A protein has these predicted regions:
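Short alpha-helical scaffolding segments that buttress acidic/His motifs in well-ordered protein cores
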Residues: 77-85, 107-111, 158
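Short, basic alpha-helical nucleic acid-contact segments in DNA-binding proteins
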Residues: 112-122
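Amphipathic, charged-and-aliphatic alpha-helical interface segments
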Residues: 70-88, 176
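Short coil/loop linkers at secondary-structure junctions
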Residues: 72-73, 99-100, 183
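Short, basic interhelical loop/turn and adjoining N-cap
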Residues: 97-107
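Short alpha-helix boundary/capping elements
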Residues: 45, 88-89
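Acidic, glycine-rich two-metal-ion catalytic cores of nucleic acid-processing enzymes
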Residues: 1-70, 127-203
Length: 204
């Protein structure tokens, strides 16, 4: 990953990448990639409404709606959502928000009740992982995603889904360019018209 331009040394890091004279540098990123991956997985668990909320704009987005349900500010609801979705226990909420044990436990339970399709997905993925010897989950394209522990299953599923989609997109772009007559493969051509420079997070 590369720091955003506004982060410390972010601009300097990004300035390391560029193209030669007479060439043009192009870039793209994916729109709400992680939310779309989540939506894909929760749909079979009666997740139609939740999937729409994942892609909605304020004030109808998932974090705004969760904030109302949980009775906390939107920025806290967003932090809670990502923390719990990626395996945090209630003690993490206690530390993050400065809550007492009982408050943190209540918020933990309230969050999962508010996102029932995601909760059902979490449980189903956990059962699948256990049935496979606690070693892997099945990725969006059928590959094995080796996991560290049960609490990281959703993280592994969603993050791998985004990476897989980005890799497929890159392959498709190369295929389309070659169909248009561009030379892209240095192992087939003496000179090439374009090449990949870098992929990071959900940007190329």
């Amino acid at each position: 990953n590369i720091a955003r331009a506004s982060s410390i040394y972010g601009k300097e890091m990004r300035s390391l990448f560029g193209c030669g004279e007479g060439m043009v540098q192009l870039g793209f990123d994916f729109s709400s990639l992680e939310a779309r991956i989540q939506g894909h997985y929760i749909l079979p668990f009666n997740g139609d409404d939740l999937a729409e909320q994942l892609l909605a704009s304020k004030p109808n987005d998932i974090h705004s709606l969760n904030a109302k349900k949980l009775g906390i500010p939107r920025d806290q609801a967003k932090s809670v959502s990502y923390a719990l979705m990626y395996g945090a226990a209630y003690k993490k909420l206690k530390k993050m928000l400065g809550l007492a044990d009982e408050q943190a436990k209540a918020l933990f339970d309230a969050y999962w009740d508010a996102v029932e399709p995601l909760k059902n997905l979490r449980d189903a993925v956990g059962s699948s992982w256990e049935a496979r010897g606690k070693s892997f989950v099945v990725g969006v394209d059928g590959r094995k995603i080796v996991t560290r522990s049960k609490h990281s299953l959703l993280n592994a599923l969603f993050q791998s889904g985004g990476v897989i989609c980005a890799k497929y997109a890159t392959v498709f772009i190369y295929q389309l360019l070659e169909e248009q007559g561009y030379k892209c493969n240095p192992f087939k051509e003496k000179t090439i018209d374009m090449c990949g420079m870098i992929e990071y997070h959900d940007e190329c």
